Regions:
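Acidic/His- and Gly-rich active-site-bordering loop/insert found
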Residues: 9-112, 121-141
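Residue-level signal for inorganic ion chemistry
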Residues: 33, 160, 261
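Histidine/acidic-residue-rich, glycine-tolerant segments that coordinate divalent metal ions
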Residues: 103-111, 117-118, 134-256
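Short beta-strand motif preference
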Residues: 85, 194-196, 259-261
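A generic structural motif
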Residues: 72, 255-263
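Short glycine-centered, acidic/aromatic-flanked micro-motifs in structured strand/loop junctions
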Residues: 35-37, 147, 263
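Bacterial Sec-dependent N-terminal signal peptides
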Residues: 1-11
């Protein structure tokens, strides 16, 4: 038992040292992705940088997988086990990245509030470290880095799964930036997204309201009924919505309205 633990610790130390020796390089990659701050399905620079980083380490890179320009799979090695490491690199909308103790106007820009600049980079570092171990030890095994775009509401991985890109994977490893370094078992809720669009008839809200048919009324009626539905769902159910289009002026009956749902 002691010998087995010693061997495992030695393997761990070799892999960890591989990452530590390249710390400054990975820090530079993370900082660049931070500066790009690209939203889902628009991560052109971030995706290209991660592909370049992995390619320079001997990975073969297949880009544009699942018909998504910013999705890719980088592979090294052969045979089993096939280890997948997932990387994300999309930012969130409407966020400032300046480190100040007060809220700044984001001016419709995006920011890395969820730490995906670290997510994508550290996953690449882990994949490279495993690659080095496979190479140096001359052992069988395949390491695959999955460049997964649009995690923040875009369901990028769903399309990759549908394309069968994970069909040969034995184990998939995933992580997320947090305020502590730990590992734990857990579960997540499934998520369905949908946009509901309502169409009506525009009219002046003061001069001739009787001629209007408010699309916004349809959105509000739907939201009210959904809120009443909450009483009859299980405790683990989550339903969220935001009105994305509700009209342009209060004195005009809106002929179009839209609500965006997560459930």
């Amino acid at each position: 038992m002691f010998i087995s633990l010693s061997v495992a610790q030695k393997k761990y130390d070799v892999i960890l040292k591989s990452i530590e020796n390249n710390g400054s390089k990975y820090e530079n990659v993370a900082n660049q992705i931070w500066s790009f701050a690209e939203m889902g399905y628009q991560e052109e620079k971030s995706s290209a940088l991660l592909q370049k980083t992995l390619f320079e380490e001997g990975f073969s890179v297949k880009t544009g997988v699942a018909n998504i320009p910013t999705a890719f799979v980088a592979s090294y090695g052969s045979g089993s086990p096939v280890i997948a490491i997932l990387g994300e690199y999309d930012a969130l909308p409407g966020l400032s990245q300046q480190a100040v103790p007060y809220k700044l106007s984001a001016n419709d820009k995006a920011g890395h509030a969820c730490g995906h600049h670290l997510f994508g980079t550290a996953s690449a570092a882990a994949a490279i470290a495993i690659k080095n171990y496979i190479k140096n030890q001359k052992i069988s095994g395949t390491i695959k880095y999955y460049g997964c775009p649009a995690e923040e509401g875009g369901s990028g991985k769903v399309y990759m799964v549908r394309e069968g890109l994970f069909s040969e994977v034995d184990v998939a490893l995933h992580w997320h930036a947090a305020d502590e370094n730990s590992a734990s078992a857990g579960k997540a809720l499934a998520n369905k997204t949908a946009k509901f669009r309502f169409y009506g008839v525009s009219s002046h809200a003061s001069g001739s309201p009787q001629n209007g048919r408010s699309a916004l009324d349809g959105v509000e009626a739907m939201n009210n009924m959904v809120n009443m539905l909450r009483e009859h769902t299980t405790e683990s159910t989550r339903i969220h919505y935001v009105i994305t289009r509700g009209g342009n002026a209060p004195n005009v009956v809106p002929d179009f309205a839209e609500v965006y749902y997560y459930a």
